[in-house]
Structures are given as C-alpha cells and as structure tokens.
Amino acid sequence: MYSGRRCSGPIADLKLASLKRGLLISAWLLAAIVSGGGCGASLPSTDLPPSREVVAALEFPDLRDYRGIVDCRPSATGVDQLRLAELARAAQIDFICLADRVSKPTSNYGMPGFTSQVLFFPGGSFAADGGEILGIDLRDPIEPALEAPRLIEQIHRQGGVAIANHVDRFSSVSDYAAADGIAIFSLAQAWEAAGEWRIFLRALLLGPDRFFGALDVRPLEALRLYDGMARGTRVSMVAAMGAEKRLGVLGSTVGTFEQFMLISTTHLLAPERQPSPMLDALRRGHAYISFDFLGYVAQFAFYAVDGEHKTMMGDEAAFSPTLSLKVQLPSQADEIAIVAGGAPVARASNSDRLESLVKSPGVYRAEAYRGGHPWILSNPVYLR
C-alpha cells in the first residue's frame, strides 16, 4: 500500500528530470509563440533585386542566365497555372517545368508556352523502380506502369527530356542510365526526410532562414551516384522542388510555393528564353543550382580555359597540361571547391573566385558554401 510518503531513488529522480524537461520545453515553446520567433508564414530573406533583369552569362556573353524551377506539382494543392505564374513572377522565376504525378495515360501535362511572362514546360512525374522519372516537354500519353528504362524511351520518343529523381531509391543505376539528367537535390525529399514533427517544431522555434537552412544539406548519396554516372557519360545536374507541403503552424502555413520558390533554383544558360534553346541547355548541362536564400545568384561561371579557348559547364574538352579551371561567384563564399570523383582537388576560403591548373583528365565540377550549407553547385566540365 502507498504510504503517502515522497518516493526517492533513481525512478523518482527520472520522473522529476522528465517533468523538469517537459516544463522547460513548454516554457521554450510558449516563449517562441509569444515572441513570434518561428518562421510561420514568413518568407526567406532572399535578397531579390527590385525587378527581374536577365543578365548575360559570365564569360559567355552570347548566352543569358535564366533561373527557374524543375519539378513543380501544383495539382496536389489545387494551384492553377495562372496563380502559379503570379507566384513565380513575384519570386523572379523565368521558367517552370511542370511535373504532376501521372497515374494513368494522359495528354494533359499543363499548358505549354508563356503564362504571365513565365515560360512553362508541360510534363509529369512517373513512379518507377523505387525512384521517379520526370518527363519534361511532354505532349503524348505515356503508360505510367512502365519500368524506368521504357519510360525514358517513351519520353525521348516524343522529344522530351528525362530526369531521374530520388536516385538513391532506385534498385540499380541501370534503371536510369539513359536519363538526360539527375536531380541531385529534392526540396520535397529533404522535407520528408526531416519528418513532420521535426518540421513543425523547427517552424515554431526558428526564423525562416534557419528553418529552411536545415533542409539545405549536401546530398551525399545523390552526388556520389551522379559522379559515378558522369564518369562514363555526360549527364545534366538539376535541383527538384516537388509539391508544396502547406503545414499548419499555429494559424500560419509553412512549405508553400511562395516560400519554396525563394529557396533553390536551377539556372539554364541559353541564348533566348524559348522552348528549344532552353531544353537544349537542360540536356547539355549548361546549368547550375543555387540556394538563393543564402544569397541571390544572378550570375555564376565554372569553365575550363586553355589559351583563348573556353569550355563551359556541361561541355567536353581535350585534356592539356596548360589547361586551368576557373570559378567565378557573384559574391564571396565561405568555401569554394573544385571536385573530381567526389573529392576536392582545389579549395579557396572567403573568396569569390578560384583558379586551378588541371593535373589529369577527369570530370570536374564546382561547389560553393555559406554557413556550412551548399550555396552553388555547378554542372561538370568533362576533360577527356
């Protein structure tokens, strides 16, 4: 029988510690709520310029630097294309590749062309062999139950671009070996990996930049798979977005398109903003990824130079002992690295540029970091 006396010992101490911890967490949450410290419906502090001005690509003035979204899925939350275009214009987005999930054969992949001055590419996403295949610039129906190699074949048959997404979930690299590109980062996948409760608490307690920064983690496995594939063939690197999440946090909403469009973008370097040259840039890897909440990126260059000849991202050149690789950033990064085979071969700290002589043939790409998070990831230069 319980004597009415206060218990002591390890169990009582554990209960007391748990109670104190619970009270501390409750007080912390209450302070965050009262102070409005969480991100709520706040936007990341992406320092967009006053208006969108498309600029020439650094070192390649015949091309323009267009920023956009690959893998946008508006139907999941009922956002129509006109509203999506309005959100894109506010975020200074130049193009969007639509990718709603395809569950049955359809020719409704969204409206192609310009909507409110934003260029849309119709397309869809197909679940396949554990991962996903994104089809860009689609018109004709495709059977979604096909295996990944057949899906890629059907996308190519109608002139579309095939991107492998969630590559770490495929059972084999051979499933997506014929794809034009790989999405090495997926905002939706990063969200899912964090877990809804962790997302909720972060949104409650952290400001928007720290909250979204927690999702911006170097995608180690995807980069490993990408580097392995790029050793044997040229393949484009992009970032995927996915569907908006719209998580309710005390009357606010987190994970909206309005927020996501300010986090990361895929840049295409093309002579004009028309479907054909833009798709060509995507196929050829004339592209790079930027996480703009760490600093708006209007221009970036990674290229090889040998005398007067320059080779841009996505292109191939013959190796020469006089050849060097150059990185040019729009502003200073905490760290810049030139990477080959997943390992850095040259580094610079607190700089906006890096140059290095090349010692051997290989597949080289550039990475720039701020605050320990990826800021800019380039497509490779292939030196054979």
What are these language model-derived features?
Residues 25-34:
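Bacterial N-terminal signal peptides
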Residues 16, 21:
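Cationic, low-complexity basic patches in intrinsically disordered or flexible, solvent-exposed regions
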Residues 41-65, 69, 77-81, 231-237, ...:
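C-terminal functional module detector
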Residues 32-33, 83, 112, 254:
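Hydrophobic alpha-helical membrane context
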Residues 37-38:
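C-terminal motif of bacterial Sec signal peptides marking the signal peptidase cleavage site
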Residues 43-202, 206-207, 212, 216-224, ...:
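A metal-dependent hydrolase metal-coordination microenvironment
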